[in-house]
């Protein structure tokens, strides 16, 4: 859960509703959990869905979960993160933050192919987005983590339209009371993203392998007994 609260210093609406950041991410977690629950055959692995708090205060909720994990860290196969799902329609690409660090990117690429999409790296790594959401605490603990969502190459309008939509959100709604629900949202891209991440998660949940960090990655899997 991600909420900035209220700001009495503001004129007019003082409430940061956080409709996109991050009510959409929480709704996405619930949707994927429901999809797992309704499958006729349960997954081979346990799948945990966690909505943590205080992301905007320094990723404190996910930090607490990792530091007080009910499970030994080396037994956690992977982390898949959802945060602020884009609402500007379907895209031809998927942006993976920290692309190339772990074999989860290979799983993502294979799943994206079934949707006719390609996976690309974040084109602004200097902004440190990989370390600004809750998956970062799992990565620091050595657990391969995936954070991916629709890229900016939109089916309708291409890169120009995607960048315009992203810039408009950042300038006018990101971390502002104006981040409200909009009845004109285009859910097609979000649905594609949730189906994609479900596929990656379900594939991992039905296998015994553990995703690994690639050579040269900034992290390594936790040693037995690590907390």
Task: Walk through the language-model features, giving the residues of each.
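Metal-dependent peptidase/peptidase-like ectodomains
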Residues: 52-170
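Short acidic (Asp/Glu) and glycine-rich catalytic loops that position anionic groups and cofactors
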Residues: 9, 84-90, 173-179
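Soluble non-cytosolic domains of exported or imported proteins
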Residues: 19-27, 56-60, 98-102, 129-132, ...
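Catalytic-core environment of secreted peptidases
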Residues: 1-50
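Second-shell loop/turn segments in exported
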Residues: 10-22, 51, 91-99, 122-128, ...
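Beta-strand segments within the central parallel beta-sheet cores of soluble alpha/beta enzyme folds
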Residues: 44-53, 78-81, 214-216
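Sec-exported extracytoplasmic/periplasmic mature domains
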Residues: 31-41, 67-71, 109, 113-117, ...
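His/Asp/Glu-rich mid-to-C-terminal helical/loop segments that flank catalytic regions of hydrolases
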Residues: 34, 38, 155-222
């Amino acid at each position: 859960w991600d909420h900035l609260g209220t700001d009495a210093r503001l004129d007019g609406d003082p409430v940061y509703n956080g409709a996109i950041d991050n009510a959409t991410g929480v709704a996405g977690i619930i949707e994927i959990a429901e999809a797992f629950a309704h499958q006729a055959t349960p997954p081979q692995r346990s799948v945990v869905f966690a909505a943590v708090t205080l992301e905007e205060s320094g990723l404190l909720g996910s930090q607490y979960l990792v530091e007080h994990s009910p499970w030994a860290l080396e037994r956690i196969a992977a982390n898949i993160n959802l945060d602020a799902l884009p609402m500007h329609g379907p895209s031809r690409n998927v942006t993976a933050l920290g692309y190339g660090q772990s074999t989860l990117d290979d799983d993502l690429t294979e799943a994206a192919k079934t949707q006719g999409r390609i996976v690309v790296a974040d084109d602004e790594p200097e902004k440190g987005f990989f370390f600004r959401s809750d998956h970062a605490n799992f990565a620091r603990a050595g657990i391969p983590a995936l954070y991916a969502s629709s890229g900016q190459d939109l089916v309708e309008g291409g890169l120009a339209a995607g960048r315009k939509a992203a810039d408009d959100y950042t300038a006018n709604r990101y971390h502002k009371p104006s981040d409200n629900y909009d009845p004109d949202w285009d859910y097609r891209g979000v649905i594609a993203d949730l189906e994609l991440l479900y596929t990656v998660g379900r594939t991992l949940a039905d296998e015994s392998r553990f995703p690994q960090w690639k050579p040269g990655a900034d992290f390594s899997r936790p040693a037995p007994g690590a907390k």
